[in-house]
Amino acid sequence: MSNQMRKLAGQTMVYGISTVLVRLLNYLLVPYLTRVMERAQYGVVSHIYAVIPFVLVILTMGLESGYFRFAGKASGEGEKRRVFATAWGMVSLVSVLFFVLVLLFNGTIAEWMGYAAHPSYIWMTGAIVALDAVTAIPFARLREQSRSGRYVLLRLVSVVVNLALCFFFYGWLPSLAGRGILPWAYDPAMGPGYVFVANLAASAVTLLLILPMCGGVAPRIDRRLARSLLVYSLPLLLSGIAGTANEFIDRQMVLWLTPGGSEYALEQLGVYGAVIKLGVVMTLFTSMYRLAAEPFFLAEFKGDDFRRTNAEAMKYFIIVSIFIFLFIALFRDLFALILGRDFREGVWILPIVLLSNMLSGIVLNLSFWYKQTGATKYAIYVTGTGLLFTVAFNILLVPSLGYVGAAVARLVCESAMVALSYLLNRRYCPVPYDLKRIGEYVLLGALLYGAGVLCGSLTGWLRYLI
């Protein structure tokens, strides 16, 4: 393992431990909410939360990657501060304008999304997204400066606030209100709305805590620098919109295309959303790798160091991903116990979900060359192609297969993006990936998984032993 690879691995471990801790705390909400909510109510949460990342991508405008690249090329600390102030200023301005529009058209948006009886869901979601967008660039600065401790602390505080409030609203508040304590604070008609109240409070606390960590730099837009940042980042914005749609439009299409009425569609969406949560370990690994790899690969490299390091990183990423896939897929019946009983029927699609998450990480690795070289237009080609596959296969499969069709459609989408990303890489910036060795790892993983399935699953043997 090269020195640069050791550095990346070390950064990944730092973010990994913290990300796992934060996500595991947040993940406690899944078994809790799937027990205190009906399937249709959890479907509402899954539906609205599927929209949040999409809007967040628009508001941040690809400027996180833009900040990493321009800060990496900056000649001094003063120039870095100017890059930070400009990127933060643009995102903050757009976020404020967005929230004003949400307030002005709150009722219309609520009616369009099917929540006319609960317009508060919409303005609270708008506030959550705006606050998260405003903190995105300061969080990126903490990563660029390798201040992982403060990054982790803020994320941890946010999750703890969210978690504590959800437990309070759904566990303690109904009982307190029934005894005449805080009766004004509890409204049974809010249903899943208290999830958004808790998230909004957590996002507000995060903003208040991160402001003192910005080193006295205020949002301020340098027009000349802003133009350069936008030229680099806007293709990533368009790519991010398509990429987020690839990740989350399947939930919306399950809601639209599942036959049997809106209530049944929400129930199916609730099951699908819960099963996707079971793939959290693979998602965690990809997330912690991205947190470390993005600022790492967008910094300046000498000669062919970037290509060699990227090839080595891909190999190790795939090795770890295969281990994670085997662990969760072969023990999926045990992982299913995390969910409420009504949500376990869809657990058999978990291997498909895991493969999709693994391919998503491979696409991430294949994207660094065009971000490093400034050829960000290719991001649009890749994610746009993926979106076409997503929409086409969801339309084709969901009406007959329901959420199973959505899972298969996402797998096809990620496969197509991997193929196109690799072809573009070979043509414009050939990275010497060790395909022979990677193929051997994949084949070994497939054989081990097949052996586990043929043996009747490892969890079946465990049940007999226990």
Feature map (PLM): residue ranges:
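Hydrophobic alpha-helical transmembrane segments
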Residues: W123, V152-G215, G384-F389, Y403-L424
